[in-house]
Amino acid sequence: MSILVVTGTSTDVGKTVVTAALAAAAREAGLSVAVCKPAQTGVAPGGPGDLAEVTRLSGVTAVVELARYPEPLAPDTAARRSGLPMLRCADVVETVRALDDGHDLVLVEGAGGLLVRLGAEGFTLVDLARALDAPAVVVAAAGLGTLNHTELTIRALSAAGLACAGTVIGSWPDEPGLAERCNLDDLPAVTGVDVVGSVPAGSGRLASASFGAAASTWFDSTWLKSTLTRL
C-alpha cells in the first residue's frame, strides 16, 4: 500500500488528467486504486468536480472529496469568503490513511501549486505530504516559463525534505515548438529530476476506454513499472 501526491507548478497544468492517467495505469496493472481531492474550488454543490473527471477517464470509483467551495480561489480564501468550514490537515491525513488501508495505491491531488493554502492554519500540500510521508509527482507545463516554475517547485519539495518521484508534462502539444523541445531536454538538467511522462494535449477529451488503453504509454515504462512494483 502506498500514497503518491500529485502537485503542479501552477493551476491548469494538467494535474487532474495526470492523476487519472496514473490511476488508469495502476488499474491496468491490477492494482486497487483510490483518489483523494482534499479541496475542490470553483464548482457549485452537486456539480461535477475534478474527481468526476478522474472517474470518467480512469474508471476508479473510490474517490473522496473532503471540502468544496463555489468560488474559483485558493481553498482557504474560498472557505473564508463562503463562510464554510476550513479543511483541517489532520482530517485529510486520517482520510488518506484510511483509504491506504484498503487500496494498493492512493493518489492525492492537490489544488493549484505546491504552496497554495488548503485550509486551517495555512497548511499546504507540503504539510500534508510530510504528514503522510509521501513522495510527490510534479505536473509541469511544456512551454516557456516551465524551467523556472518546475525548479522552484522541486526546490520547495527538497527544502521540506520531501522526495520528488518525477516530473510529468501535463499537456504535450501535437506539434511542439522550439521551447517545448528544449524544455524536455533541459528540465532534468535544471531540476535534477527526470521527466517520467508526457500526456498528449487533449487526452482529457478521450472516451474512457481509449484513455485507459493509452494511459500507461504516456509514462516511461521503466519508471512506471518500478513505481507500481514498489507498492
Curated annotation (Swiss-Prot):
Family: Belongs to the dethiobiotin synthetase family.
UniProt enzyme class: ligase
Quaternary organization: Homodimer.
Gene Ontology CC terms, in alphabetical order: cytosol
E.C. code: 6.3.3.3
Pathway in which this enzyme or protein is active: Cofactor biosynthesis; biotin biosynthesis; biotin from 7,8-diaminononanoate: step 1/2
Binding site for substrate: 41
MF term (GO), any: magnesium ion binding
Designated name of the protein: ATP-dependent dethiobiotin synthetase BioD
Annotated source species: Rhodococcus jostii (strain RHA1)
Coiled-coil zones: none
Keywords linked to the UniProt accession: ATP-binding, Biotin biosynthesis, Cytoplasm, Ligase, Magnesium, Metal-binding, Nucleotide-binding
Function statement: Catalyzes a mechanistically unusual reaction, the ATP-dependent insertion of CO2 between the N7 and N8 nitrogen atoms of 7,8-diaminopelargonic acid (DAPA, also called 7,8-diammoniononanoate) to form a ureido ring.
Residue positions binding ATP: 12-17, 50, 109-112, 170-171, 200-202
GO biological process, one term: biotin biosynthetic process
Entry binding sites for Mg(2+): 16, 50, 109
